[in-house]
Amino acid sequence: MAKDSPSPLGASPKKPGCSSPAAAVLENQRRELEKLRAELEAERAGWRAERRRFAARERQLREEAERERRQLADRLRSKWEAQRSRELRQLQEEMQREREAEIRQLLRWKEAEQRQLQQLLHRERDGVVRQARELQRQLAEELVNRGHCSRPGASEVSAAQCRCRLQEVLAQLRWQTDGEQAARIRYLQAALEVERQLFLKYILAHFRGHPALSGSPDPQAVHSLEEPLPQTSSGSCHAPKPACQLGSLDSLSAEVGVRSRSLGLVSSACSSSPDGLLSTHASSLDCFAPACSRSLDSTRSLPKASKSEERPSSPDTSTPGSRRLSPPPSPLPPPPPPSAHRKLSNPRGGEGSESQPCEVLTPSPPGLGHHELIKLNWLLAKALWVLARRCYTLQEENKQLRRAGCPYQADEKVKRLKVKRAELTGLARRLADRARELQETNLRAVSAPIPGESCAGLELCQVFARQRARDLSEQASAPLAKDKQIEELRQECHLLQARVASGPCSDLHTGRGGPCTQWLNVRDLDRLQRESQREVLRLQRQLMLQQGNGGAWPEAGGQSATCEEVRRQMLALERELDQRRRECQELGTQAAPARRRGEEAETQLQAALLKNAWLAEENGRLQAKTDWVRKVEAENSEVRGHLGRACQERDASGLIAEQLLQQAARGQDRQQQLQRDPQKALCDLHPSWKEIQALQCRPGHPPEQPWETSQMPESQVKGSRRPKFHARPEDYAVSQPNRDIQEKREASLEESPVALGESASVPQVSETVPASQPLSKKTSSQSNSSSEGSMWATVPSSPTLDRDTASEVDDLEPDSVSLALEMGGSAAPAAPKLKIFMAQYNYNPFEGPNDHPEGELPLTAGDYIYIFGDMDEDGFYEGELDDGRRGLVPSNFVEQIPDSYIPGCLPAKSPDLGPSQLPAGQDEALEEDSLLSGKAQGMVDRGLCQMVRVGSKTEVATEILDTKTEACQLGLLQSMGKQGLSRPLLGTKGVLRMAPMQLHLQNVTATSANITWVYSSHRHPHVVYLDDREHALTPAGVSCYTFQGLCPGTHYRVRVEVRLPWDLLQVYWGTMSSTVTFDTLLAGPPYPPLDVLVERHASPGVLVVSWLPVTIDSAGSSNGVQVTGYAVYADGLKVCEVADATAGSTVLEFSQLQVPLTWQKVSVRTMSLCGESLDSVPAQIPEDFFMCHRWPETPPFSYTCGDPSTYRVTFPVCPQKLSLAPPSAKASPHNPGSCGEPQAKFLEAFFEEPPRRQSPVSNLGSEGECPSSGAGSQAQELAEAWEGCRKDLLFQKSPQNHRPPSVSDQPGEKENCYQHMGTSKSPAPGFIHLRTECGPRKEPCQEKAALERVLRQKQDAQGFTPPQLGASQQYASDFHNVLKEEQEALCLDLRGTERREERREPEPHSRQGQALGVKRGCQLHEPSSALCPAPSAKVIKMPRGGPQQLGTGANTPARVFVALSDYNPLVMSANLKAAEEELVFQKRQLLRVWGSQDTHDFYLSECNRQVGNIPGRLVAEMEVGTEQTDRRWRSPAQGHLPSVAHLEDFQGLIIPQGSSLVLQGNSKRLPLWTPKIMIAALDYDPGDGQMGGQGKGRLALRAGDVVMVYGPMDDQGFYYGELGGHRGLVPAHLLDHMSLHGH
């Protein structure tokens, strides 16, 4: 470019006079401007190319969007068509089902109407026939009467002519009547058949789908059908019946036509308006019901019309009336032509007859009606099919649209696109703002004054700035335009979706045959969105680059530092903005999964919380249900036990009654033998009377007294300890010769207090009984037994006779001869026994089957009855209620209260004096007397085995200090007894104690606890206080309460108080409440393991116990406590522990099972620092596990007779047939007069079963103390030694025992029933050895005979045990007996020290275990040393004197300690030299301790039947918690089965780990049933015919069969047992419990 060339911008060239710097600057500006122009042009070319490319891209996008739209439309159309087809198909099926239902209903209506029509036709026909015959008969009679034949002068010709004419008339009449009637009936039958065929053809045509025929129904047919039939009878005022019948049929056919036309209307309407099909169909369905009702109503109205029409007024009108049945237009017999009938049905001449073939019955041809019917059916089927298809298609489309939910997804996509569009719009606006700011900055930079700048340069800068601003605005508008296009595409897609979702259109039918399309693909929308976003971002980057490149245009030569700084700041800001945007996107991407994870975690947390709450609630409910089930099971088992014992007692009583009757018969025979010589007695009467007078005149003889006993002075009664017997003169004479025998018997009875079999009574013969003393049934049985006892007493005693008599008495129940034994044990008969019973059920004697209910007492459940004497042969007691009423009481409705035996409460004045002989006015004295006697017996110490026999109130008064005070208390006791208070619970010596006793806490957890108590009265409620705040009120009769919602680790104080009514509060009751404290656990207990399984190991004699470990958290805790391991229990006894929180199995060897044959189930508990969990679900031990262990063969019963003072008896014990019955100590009545066989008598007493009821005389023999001294005391010690030997033998255990034997607490027994378990070895397992060291020598032959007889004896049923107040009361009572036994050991000492030394000598191959405080002279051996090894190397044997010989005083009581941890002195003792004197014990084992700690903090203790020292730091003293009420010792643990620690407490504190418990009391206290071995007493055949069909599944028994019994007795009195390999039901009343001397 030349210097003088004009400037492109119109600027003039520089003048020569200008300075060169300005020209240079201007030149530079021009060059820069040219450069900028070139760049601008290049940029514009690039922009144009970019625009073209964008336009092509836009067209491509539009085409793709159009294609996608078409695809979306095709998919929507195909889906809509598929949905419509499905909905139409469903609608068609529904319509078809409705149609079938309508057809079935129509068929039922038609059949019903046809049956009605047939019945009407038959009745009409019968009536018409009868009427026609009657008319014929009347006509014949009239013709005969009025004819010539009836005249006297008529000839035979005229008569014959009359008869011929009569026959012709009758024939014509018969032809007219019968012919027309028969034709009419045939016609109606044919009409019915045709109508049935038409209807069937109509139905078949609907199902077969015949081709359509042209034709339309006549709308006037409906009106013509609804018109009534015209009266067509020509000579009658009544409408003919066949016309009415025909009208009903025609109306029915007309209704069918209406139905067909309605359906035809539906088919015609289907083509015009498919939407109205449903309403039309509904109307068509509804139009049939009223028509059918009208037809039925018309049919029902026919009989009424017929009755009204059959009333002929006279014989003249009968002939026309007989022709009413024939149609008037036709007199001929055949049916009328169809035209006539059509006139009848349609008088207007057949309008619409071609289109409605069903309007008439048979006038139209069958072909035409069938054709039209097929046509109508086809039209209906077609319309129905179209409608069903349409409805089904619509329904499917609607379901698909609702199920797909695409509109909602599309809406969400649209919302997201809108949000992104808003963001892009904001970004574009921000870019525009920034461009505007840059433009302003450039303008300010350009407008800055530059020295030497010309006006042309300024204008050029302005123009460039404006151009730059336009370019920037165009660049900003490009993304906005793209956004608008995207928005338009979105709107089009949304509109398309809205049109598709709005419903199908008519134009969519054209695309029915096209390809199947789908909904708008969400991926395509996402792809378009991503592409648009990428495009916008690319434009933004280009804009930013252009801004960066074009920022230097307004500057001249880069001299403006401000523009460069601004550009750098802008670039930095843009980069920072992009970086922040990317970070935001990344954070948003990361936030979405995090948000989803948070929502999922929250959802899982809520679900876990809900599940936890549900599980807690379910656990609580199941726990409550389990507690309730356990309680119900316990109650049921107790009731079953009572019922079983009652049934056994009833059966045994029946046998005893038969035996008593036999004895009575024998006694009567003997009395008759004594009275066989009355004449001789009369002759000898006078000399005998003189002899009696002479004897009475002797000095010192008591004066003669009348037969009735006179009242003795009270001072004389006080001076005597034994009731005196005043005999009658006659009896005195008879008894005088036998006085020597009587004195001998009394001396022998005093010398030996153990009476074992025979009675030694005073000879007495009561031959005369005054008539003024009526005897009850009980008194008669007593007199019989006493008379027979006197007969036995008069016979001289000899060894043979005594043996026979003993065997006879042994066959009977001991209580059956209790009265005879009482009279035989003293000079006078003892008073009847007073026992207290409680009524178990309500009983009204007048509702029973007895013949004399007036002599029985009505009973109410819970009442106390005072029983005198024993049960009679009918099973009744003589009793008295609290209100003084006396009478007979049925034994099966009452149950005896424990320790309620009261010795004779009446003065013994006559051998026949019974309770029934007392006057009614002496009731109060009797009650007071019984209470005083009860107090006297309550004063007797249980451990001293003494019983004070009280004869009268004055004798008791000598033993009591303050009689007046006690008399007042007795009066109050009587009044309280009448108010429902239990006399045994009223207190000792009249102390009125109403406070609940034996409070015990059980099931103590962190938040709950259960308290139980024993109430003094079941008629008053109790208030439970928690921390001296009233917590709850329990109703009367409830003795337990459960605390809920307690705080963990908190000390609580519970007080239970009885709430009495206001009238009883006036009496001073002493204490009315009891208090107990407890602490809740800190946490826990842990949950028990699951899925416990017991399997046999591959090795013999090994069991594998597996379980599912409890779920623990990361800290190893379950339910908040640390899990330390698991403990395995077998039937409640711990056998092993596993010190691993995750252990799942363990192995049990046969040597670990102490009494394996008794075990049935194994449970596992979870151990923790806060105790053990509840038992898991028990697992059954395999039955074949014990079969693999064969015990060595045992020889039969044998004995050895060695030293004269000692002998050994060996009893074989069968592992499968050992006794399960709990034998108890008892002393059978025995005649000590025969001194030649004491050992045989000992064996008899040794093996006898416990009696059901123990009489005071038998108690006198076994535990009472005779009034005599000297030889009597020695005999008593000897008897106690023998008794101890017998009991210790019976209570030994062996590994073969099914169950450890136990002792049942018999009423009235005060014998110490505490047993010790030995730990000595035995040379031969399976044998029980008895080594006696006391008693005189017996001849071998007598020993053998006695032993054989003992083995032959059949065992009686298990003794009746009265209801126990609680399991732990028995244990507490036995524990108290142990404590008293120590005191008793100070007073008792067997003769000689030689036997003591012999007792200390060890047996070869065995070690003798000696129990603490033993007072028996026998050695006990037990084959269980392999299972229970000796715990210490040094055996410290207990001397006979008890602990007082070891340094403790006689009055030092034993205390109970519990071991806090395991202790082995050989390993853990600090002084190894003294370790031999220390005992080995295990954790939670109970120890008996005497005295206090020594200087080394050691106690003197007894453990495992060894005495030694124990460290005081490892034991803690237990509060036994017994209290003495009513001379009974009770434990707080009443009402539940105690834990192992409590059981060990009350079992004598000698049970180490690995040994079984010697449970005392009834076997029903055991939680699980074990098999029992019983013996059949009688034969039983279930198939003898008496059982009927009930004998199936029962076993046949023979007397002596041994039966294995499984489980308790059922409701019908049967056991489930096994005999000879067969299992079934056996009757419980025919089974006896076996003892050791059984089979």
UniProtKB/Swiss-Prot annotation:
Q: Where in the cell is it found?
A: Cytoplasm, Cytoskeleton
Q: Which residues form a coiled coil?
A: 21-143, 409-442, 480-619
Q: Where is the composition biased (Low complexity)?
A: 776-790
* Annotated spans, Disordered: 1-22, 215-240, 295-364, 697-811, 1251-1273, 1292-1325, 1392-1413
- Give me the stretches of Pro residues compositional bias: 326-339
Locate the compositionally biased regions of type Polar residues. Answer: 707-718, 761-775, 1293-1305
**Which Pfam families does the record match to this protein?**
SH3_2
Task: Give the InterPro entries listed for this entry.
Answer: FN3_dom, FN3_sf, Ig-like_fold, RIMBP1/2/3, SH3-like_dom_sf, SH3_domain
GO biological process annotations for this chain's record? Answer: fertilization; spermatid development
Cite the record's Basic and acidic residues compositional bias ranges.
Answer: 1392-1406
Domain SH3 per the UniProt entry, residue ranges:
832-899, 1452-1520, 1569-1636
Family designation: Belongs to the RIMBP family.
Quaternary structure and interacting proteins, as annotated? Interacts with LRGUK (via guanylate kinase-like domain). Interacts (via C-terminus) with HOOK1 (via coiled-coil region). May interact with FASLG.
Q: What is this protein called?
A: RIMS-binding protein 3C
Q: Which organism is it from?
A: Homo sapiens
